[in-house]
Amino acid sequence: MKKHLLTSFSKSLFALLLIGSNVSAQQKDTTSRPIHLNQIGFYPAAVKKAIVVSDKGGDFFIQTTQKKTVYTGKLNTSLRPNFAGHIVQYADFSAFGKPGKYVLYVPSVGYSYPFEVKASVHKAVADAAIKAYYFMRSGTALPEKYAGKWHRVEGHPDTVVLIHPSAESEGRKAGSIIASPRGWYDAGDYNKYIVNSGITTSTLLSLYEDFPAYMKTVKLKIPESNNKVPDVLDEVLWNLRWMLTMQDPADGGVYHKLTNAAFDKFEMPDKDKSPRYMVQKGTAATLDFAAVMAQASRIFKQYPKELPGLADSCITAAKKAWGWAVKNPEVAYRQEEINKKFEPKITTGAYGDNNFTDEFIWAASELVATTRDVAYLKNINLLPDNRMPVPTWSQVRLLGYYTLIKSDITENVVQDLPEIKKRLISTADDMISGVDSN
């Protein structure tokens, strides 16, 4: 099954790379915009295809950068035009696998952007994708030694965060101050959101959990690179330690976000001096938190000397969050309603959700996988409908399925497991079919 999922991911990545391939083609040379391919390159034994948006040409040629032809093939016309309505042909040169730097040439059309064929061809891209999280760190300077031309000074230390009236509790009155440092900034603003962090942090934890041997070799050139913890986990820790500060220690509930009242201006982090607020607890945030902490606990348990007590802290926090969610199963974050009742009004990203079935499935699955206590699945309907939705911040059900399947939990314990496996494989097959038929 894992092979199905990895194949699906690889083909989806290929499709995404094709979509963006003409961005770099805007060079004053002989490259042709109608020829779209993976500009980074291909593994020697992998599928290799290029899309030619033209009805011209019959043959295509793989040439060295010195224009020496090393492979020849026939263009195949697509069974249907692309979304723009143009005639689309594709060049399949999967049979060619000699390492080197090449271009694809189609007479009457032109040359492709240069690409490579080599082992580990996507390593630099993969490393850069993970290193991107370092640049999103809040509450720390990014020295030039690690950040290069994107170096900057510290912004948003978040040592003085106000409890918003929507988040008031008996032990934390509105206006009281707490500290909530670290974490990652969100997509285009300087706020920090638990719901977004949930799926993001879990994705990186799963990357390590699924490929531990490889991830231990990945060096990201971050300040923690010389310690004995894999760099990807060091980066996770920057956000995970912030997430732990988002839980109310009194009752286990988790605040939805740490935010300014409104979005920032387009300015560097250190220039923003706006008050920061901890906003309402919610069921979605609390369950996402529980899931991540349970997953983190079983992973960081492998590093007791380097991170003493962290695994225990994570599972304790996860259990406490679960307890709050069970008592408060339908607390939705509705920003418009909050703004009718409280000041200041909060107008940053809402990331609201009104259905928590998927969050309960995910959190319960992670807790079962970590604690081996199947009681967490009691009263949880693992298959509430026939859908197998692709994970996103607002739909995390499949993350729970994937965890259950990867664990050594048997169908004797979880009776729905065979059906979950069947549906997951079918979904992966559909994804592959969609790529192949487009």
List where the protein language model places each region.
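Interdomain boundary/hinge segments at the C-termini of tandem beta-sandwich modules
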Residues: 117-119
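Glycan-recognition and catalytic cores of secretory/periplasmic carbohydrate-active enzymes
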Residues: 29-34, 59-86, 97-113, 122-438
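Contiguous beta-strand segments within globular domains
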Residues: 31-56
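Beta-strand secondary-structure signal
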Residues: 49-51, 90, 103
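Short, hydrophobic beta-strand segments
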Residues: 91-97
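Charged interaction patches that mediate protein-protein contacts
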Residues: 20, 83-90
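Bacterial Sec-dependent N-terminal signal peptides
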Residues: 1-28
